[in-house]
């Protein structure tokens, strides 16, 4: 049955307008993005097929061009639209943490850092530099490593923090393996960074480890 033949309350577009995007399933949201299905399959049917083929929403969203276009019903035009949508989402979150914005929402910080790091195939270590009033100065990626390591030097981080006149930092790095549980090495480098920055009265407020669908906070664990 085509979507236009469904009861109005069950159609993805009408459902979104009535209840908001958060009320829709992954398949329904993807169906709106796809707009149309293929012969014998509605857009929602196709969306469900694609989620099954990719193994979920995240692998679909992070697929490269070749993998994306290998599925029936997708192509370069859809890939371009998807990449543009994802980048708009990242930039929207980034705009909420522009220079001078005060950090009033831990959830927003977590979402922003996740959007910047979770999709990366390599490990990256980043920092959010803040002034003494915890207003954003700058977000920077400090190092990029292999799939299992990233080099971070406390002396260089301290020098950068002083150059930006930062009063506090929030660190974040991703685990491409998808497991967000911090390693012993993660805890050691965080302590070294905290000790080095503490010599200049610069506080480390938190360190987030970003995994697949999970983010671990050092502050929430009582490690900072």
Swiss-Prot record:
UniProt keyword Transcription regulation, yes or no: no
Keywords: Hydrolase, Metal-binding, Metalloprotease, Protease, Zinc
Family matches, as SUPFAM superfamilies: JAB1/MPN domain (SSF102712), RuvA domain 2-like (SSF47781)
Top-level lineage group: Bacteria
Keyword Protease carried by entry: yes
GO molecular function: metal ion binding; metallopeptidase activity
PROSITE patterns: MPN (PS50249), UPF0758 (PS01302)
GO BP term (any one): proteolysis
Signal peptide: none
UniProt xrefs under Pfam families: RadC, UPF0758_N
Sites where the protein binds Zn(2+): 173, 175, 186
InterPro entries associated with the record: MPN, RadC_JAB, RuvA_2-like, UPF0758, UPF0758_CS, UPF0758_N
Positions of the MPN domain: 102-224
Span(s) of short sequence motif JAMM motif: 173-186
NCBIfam families: PRK00024.1, radc
Family, similarity comment: Belongs to the UPF0758 family.
Protein name: UPF0758 protein Csal_2972
